[in-house]
Amino acid sequence: MGNTTSDRVSGERHGAKAARSEGAGGHAPGKEHKIMVGSTDDPSVFSLPDSKLPGDKEFVSWQQDLEDSVKPTQQARPTVIRWSEGGKEVFISGSFNNWSTKIPLIKSHNDFVAILDLPEGEHQYKFFVDGQWVHDPSEPVVTSQLGTINNLIHVKKSDFEVFDALKLDSMESSETSCRDLSSSPPGPYGQEMYAFRSEERFKSPPILPPHLLQVILNKDTNISCDPALLPEPNHVMLNHLYALSIKDSVMVLSATHRYKKKYVTTLLYKPI
């Protein structure tokens, strides 16, 4: 009997504790859930596999729209912008840089010029001349949404096809020339050694052409002329190396080259 009573009492105590724990367990998850959702400092909210904040879907959709709206940038084309209406300081700004900065123009004679790399398409722009925004009346204009008059330029790929073709042709010609220089000339080839004949060893050198006998360094300089200046040489005398007669144990070498309309004669003195 004593054991039965003690078991009943201990069972009632355990039943009360179990009921108390069940009651506490029924309300605790709700409170913990409210704290986790309302508090951004609780790190467990990010560890739950099924928990997503309400703005996650909106952020993902916004990011997807942003990625879809990004398009590959078009090729920039060098475009010449010119201002011919005078002024001291001229700048330009337009839709190509979101009107954020003013690009200075360089003065060339009576005009102001700038070369800008603009993508293909239409662009609005305006000049900032001596502190005032103005447009060029000689160029196409358009009225913006704010009612201001801006210049309009249309950059088209077809306008640069000639330059692209010339650039491509230049690259191909340079590659061809390099390939021709590196390759051997056409013709038969063999491994036979050339045998010199006895009469070839004692053959006299070729006769010097008569037009190469008139070396300008051997000519007497006129008294009225500047001794540092030489007479204009004949075109057949260019790009030749001349050795003058040895005098006072000094050998003189000379060569004449032409640069456009100027002639330069170089002298090399070597003691012997």
UniProtKB/Swiss-Prot annotation:
<dbReference type="GO" id="GO:0006633">
    <property type="term" value="P:fatty acid biosynthetic process"/>
</dbReference>
<dbReference type="GO" id="GO:0007165">
    <property type="term" value="P:signal transduction"/>
</dbReference>
<feature type="modified residue" description="Phosphoserine">
    <location>
        <position position="184"/>
    </location>
</feature>
<keyword id="KW-0276">Fatty acid metabolism</keyword>
<comment type="function">
    <text>Non-catalytic subunit of AMP-activated protein kinase (AMPK), an energy sensor protein kinase that plays a key role in regulating cellular energy metabolism. In response to reduction of intracellular ATP levels, AMPK activates energy-producing pathways and inhibits energy-consuming processes: inhibits protein, carbohydrate and lipid biosynthesis, as well as cell growth and proliferation. AMPK acts via direct phosphorylation of metabolic enzymes, and by longer-term effects via phosphorylation of transcription regulators.</text>
</comment>
<comment type="subunit">
    <text>AMPK is a heterotrimer of an alpha catalytic subunit (PRKAA1 or PRKAA2), a beta (PRKAB1 or PRKAB2) and a gamma non-catalytic subunits (PRKAG1, PRKAG2 or PRKAG3).</text>
</comment>
<dbReference type="GO" id="GO:0120162">
    <property type="term" value="P:positive regulation of cold-induced thermogenesis"/>
</dbReference>
<dbReference type="GO" id="GO:0005829">
    <property type="term" value="C:cytosol"/>
</dbReference>
<feature type="modified residue" description="Phosphoserine">
    <location>
        <position position="95"/>
    </location>
</feature>
<feature type="modified residue" description="Phosphoserine">
    <location>
        <position position="39"/>
    </location>
</feature>
<keyword id="KW-0444">Lipid biosynthesis</keyword>
<dbReference type="InterPro" id="IPR014756">
    <property type="entry name" value="Ig_E-set"/>
</dbReference>
<feature type="modified residue" description="Phosphoserine; by ULK1">
    <location>
        <position position="69"/>
    </location>
</feature>
<dbReference type="InterPro" id="IPR050827">
    <property type="entry name" value="CRP1_MDG1_kinase"/>
</dbReference>
<dbReference type="GO" id="GO:0005634">
    <property type="term" value="C:nucleus"/>
</dbReference>
<comment type="similarity">
    <text>Belongs to the 5'-AMP-activated protein kinase beta subunit family.</text>
</comment>
<keyword id="KW-0275">Fatty acid biosynthesis</keyword>
<keyword id="KW-0597">Phosphoprotein</keyword>
<dbReference type="GO" id="GO:0005737">
    <property type="term" value="C:cytoplasm"/>
</dbReference>
<protein>
    <recommendedName>
        <fullName>5'-AMP-activated protein kinase subunit beta-2</fullName>
    </recommendedName>
</protein>
<feature type="modified residue" description="Phosphothreonine">
    <location>
        <position position="40"/>
    </location>
</feature>
<dbReference type="GO" id="GO:0031588">
    <property type="term" value="C:nucleotide-activated protein kinase complex"/>
</dbReference>
<dbReference type="GO" id="GO:0019901">
    <property type="term" value="F:protein kinase binding"/>
</dbReference>
<dbReference type="GO" id="GO:0031669">
    <property type="term" value="P:cellular response to nutrient levels"/>
</dbReference>
<feature type="modified residue" description="Phosphoserine">
    <location>
        <position position="158"/>
    </location>
</feature>
<dbReference type="InterPro" id="IPR013783">
    <property type="entry name" value="Ig-like_fold"/>
</dbReference>
<feature type="region of interest" description="Disordered">
    <location>
        <begin position="1"/>
        <end position="52"/>
    </location>
</feature>
<dbReference type="Pfam" id="PF04739">
    <property type="entry name" value="AMPKBI"/>
</dbReference>
<feature type="modified residue" description="Phosphoserine">
    <location>
        <position position="174"/>
    </location>
</feature>
<dbReference type="InterPro" id="IPR032640">
    <property type="entry name" value="AMPK1_CBM"/>
</dbReference>
<dbReference type="InterPro" id="IPR006828">
    <property type="entry name" value="ASC_dom"/>
</dbReference>
<feature type="modified residue" description="Phosphothreonine">
    <location>
        <position position="148"/>
    </location>
</feature>
<feature type="modified residue" description="Phosphoserine">
    <location>
        <position position="108"/>
    </location>
</feature>
<dbReference type="InterPro" id="IPR037256">
    <property type="entry name" value="ASC_dom_sf"/>
</dbReference>
<keyword id="KW-0443">Lipid metabolism</keyword>
<feature type="modified residue" description="Phosphoserine">
    <location>
        <position position="170"/>
    </location>
</feature>
<dbReference type="GO" id="GO:0005654">
    <property type="term" value="C:nucleoplasm"/>
</dbReference>
<dbReference type="Pfam" id="PF16561">
    <property type="entry name" value="AMPK1_CBM"/>
</dbReference>
